């Protein structure tokens, strides 16, 4: 009996240590996740700003191994610049071509840590039918137990910069528009 108890205790300890080391999955909360952007208007005359109202995704985070992955899908027809005519234009073929390419997808293949906090997501962005490498710099990251949901929630602010012309979206270049685009992501994920 004593031998069985020792084996059971060992199995329990092994199971607990395995689950403590296992990666956690977080579902992005669509009510607290806002992919947004800044883009040039007429070579520095002003800056367009907008966001996407519909996005979904998951983040797998292994804090013990200091790595993780990310998979996010953005509905490009949910673009919102605060200007209905501009939103319509941005959905046309010279920009997102939402009829042909209804989503933009970010796939993070690894997450780099600085100490015990995520610092950068290494991955790629697929937009307008083109996939290019794009790393997200994590500006802030914090987790807490949400008192209403009784679940862990992690929030982040991340940024990246890219040339939209690399994705076949070079409208305005002949008018002097800079194609540099700054991506800002404010996100919260709920532990599953």
Where are these regions (language model features)?
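Gram-negative bacterial Sec-dependent N-terminal signal peptides
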Residues: 1-22
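Low-complexity, acidic/polar, glycine-enriched regions of mature
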Residues: 20-192
């Amino acid at each position: 009996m004593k031998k069985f108890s020792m084996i059971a205790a060992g199995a329990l300890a092994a199971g607990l240590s395995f689950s403590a080391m296992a990666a956690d999955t977080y579902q992005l909360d669509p009510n607290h996740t806002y992919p947004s952007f800044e883009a040039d208007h007429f070579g520095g005359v002003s800056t367009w700003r907008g966001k996407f109202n519909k996005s979904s995704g998951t983040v797998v985070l292994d804090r013990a191994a200091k790595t993780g992955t990310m998979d996010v899908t953005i509905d490009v027809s949910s673009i919102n610049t605060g200007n209905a005519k501009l939103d319509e234009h941005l959905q046309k073929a010279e920009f997102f071509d939402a009829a042909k390419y209804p989503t933009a997808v970010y796939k993070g293949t690894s997450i780099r840590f600085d100490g015990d906090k995520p610092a950068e997501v290494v991955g790629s962005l697929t937009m307008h039918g083109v996939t290019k490498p794009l790393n997200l710099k994590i500006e802030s990251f914090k987790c807490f137990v949400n008192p209403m949901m009784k679940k862990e929630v992690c929030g982040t602010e991340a940024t990246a910069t890219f040339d939209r012309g690399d994705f076949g979206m070079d409208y305005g270049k002949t008018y002097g528009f800079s194609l540099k685009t700054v991506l800002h992501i404010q996100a919260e994920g709920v532990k599953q």
